[in-house]
A protein has these predicted regions:
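Generic recognition of long tandem-repeat/solenoid scaffolds
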Residues: 112, 163-169
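Short, low-complexity interaction segments enriched in Ser/Thr/Pro/Gly
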Residues: 1-3, 12, 20-21, 30, ...
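Oxyanion-binding/catalytic loops of NTP- or PPi-dependent enzymes
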Residues: 48, 60-146, 159, 173-175, ...
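Short amphipathic beta-strand and strand-loop transition segments with alternating hydrophobic
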Residues: 151-157
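Classical eukaryotic N-terminal signal peptides for Sec-dependent ER targeting/secretion
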Residues: 2, 29-30, 34-54
Length: 415
């Protein structure tokens, strides 16, 4: 990227370890100057599986192991740092490095992760997913419409605090529960993340954690995730902005001697798009004569109402239409069918990243009838214009705010 005009007004600067104390690099949750615009914010704060690096910086203020939770809309990744030991990625019992942020209720039990998704195919109203989207949302939020658009069978209501709660399914053995607040559901998932860390750490107690949050989170949303963590006894050392943490991770094992290096970090998740632009450089300390690496976050931008889940739904809607055309039966509104097609759309979307066209066969989808069709990358491209037309805008906004312009052309890459 080439500078059109020197950016000014960025007094905050991050210095990269090992040449700095962590208090200078990352601050505890700060509710001042949080995003109020739905689109962009200049400033500096901290990202995702990169959380493992950020967590390591907090050992200086913690007396025991610190848990890092990359708390995404669809999945979460967990890392642990022990005193005197390098950080490690926490894997589940199947050695998978990411875990669905999901919980299912039934028979007086709670089941999490991939097992929850598997059981959800049979009881889709009992499995709660994407619950982080509810955090801090008020009465004017369109979050309920978002779940409806993606064919989730949830019922919502406003609480006395004007936040959202989700209807609890009947017949699960938890007869005293009618609704669960957003904080309560997310607290359960955060507690599961902590329990995974405890199991990975041979039963050692874990209290302290660092949690990633989207750049666009407001004070209310940040407070909501802190409240969720406190419900299960987790002490949040810091909330870290996802794309800024990615910029921090980018500096590891890199030198920027005698040059300024500018990088755009573009993160398209399941529920939102986030972009940040950072400027990296190295200066020589006058006292120690040692190099110190610095970076400024020049700008941030986002679209918090679009993400990969909407592309998956393009395929799910196609499969539904194909089934109706083949059999003359219309299972729209059937929670089990819509759950299976949404999962199928997610799977095929990923496979079409490296394939042009694939056969699709889903047995016994509805009333003993099978779905037999095809899915192609071209179909997604032809039918997702309302989505894809919004993908570039945050990047352009970030460039504008940073007074930068792109030099060069694009290159295709597989997702």
């Amino acid at each position: 990227m080439k500078a059109k005009k020197k950016a000014t007004g960025f007094e905050d600067m991050a210095i990269i370890p090992p040449f700095l104390s962590i208090q200078e690099c990352i601050s505890a949750p700060d509710f001042e100057n949080l995003p109020s615009s739905p689109f962009s914010q200049k400033g500096i704060t901290m990202r995702r599986s990169t959380i493992v690096f950020c967590v390591a910086l907090f050992l200086a203020v913690a007396n025991a192991s610190v848990l890092g939770i990359d708390f995404g809309t669809q999945f979460m990744k967990i890392a642990i740092v022990r005193p005197g030991s390098p950080f490690e990625i926490v894997t589940d019992l199947s050695s998978k490095r990411k875990t669905p942020a999901a919980v299912i209720f039934g028979d007086s039990t709670r089941i999490y992760g991939f097992d929850a998704l598997t059981l959800g195919a049979r009881k889709p109203k009992n499995v709660f997913m994407r619950m982080s989207r509810l955090l801090g949302q008020g009465p004017n939020s369109d979050v309920a419409a978002e779940f409806k658009e993606l064919k989730f069978p949830y019922e919502f209501k406003l609480t006395d605090r004007n936040t959202w709660a989700v209807k609890f399914p009947a017949g699960t053995g938890f007869d005293d529960i009618d609704y669960l607040t957003a904080e309560e559901v997310n607290a359960m998932i955060l507690d599961y993340a902590r329990n995974m860390g405890v199991l990975f750490d041979n039963g050692q107690k874990i209290v302290d954690c660092v949690v990633t949050v989207p750049s666009y989170f407001t004070q209310h949303e940040r407070q909501a995730i802190l409240d969720a963590a406190s419900l299960v006894g987790l002490n949040v050392l810091s909330l870290i902005d996802e794309t800024t943490a990615a910029a921090l991770q980018y500096t590891v094992n890199k030198e920027f001697i005698n040059k300024t290096h500018r990088v755009m970090f573009y993160d398209m998740g399941a529920g939102s798009i986030q972009v940040s632009i950072a400027e990296f450089h190295t200066l020589i300390d006058k006292k120690t004569k040692l190099p110190k690496r610095y970076f400024d976050v020049l700008s941030k931008a986002w679209d918090e109402n679009i993400g990969g889940a909407y592309l998956s739904q393009v395929l799910a809607d196609k499969f539904m239409e194909d089934f109706v055309a083949q059999h003359g039966l219309d299972p729209r509104g059937n929670a089990k069918v819509e759950y299976r097609l949404r999962a199928l759309g997610e799977k095929l979307k990923e496979m079409l990243s490296v394939n042009d066209k694939l056969p699709v066969n889903e047995g016994t989808l509805f009333e003993e009838r099978d779905l037999a069709t095809t899915a192609s990358r071209q179909f997604i491209l032809d039918n997702s214009e309302p989505i894809t037309s919004r993908l570039v805008a945050p990047a352009l906004k970030a460039l504008e705010d940073a007074h930068l312009t792109i030099v060069g052309a694009t290159a295709p890459c597989h997702a």
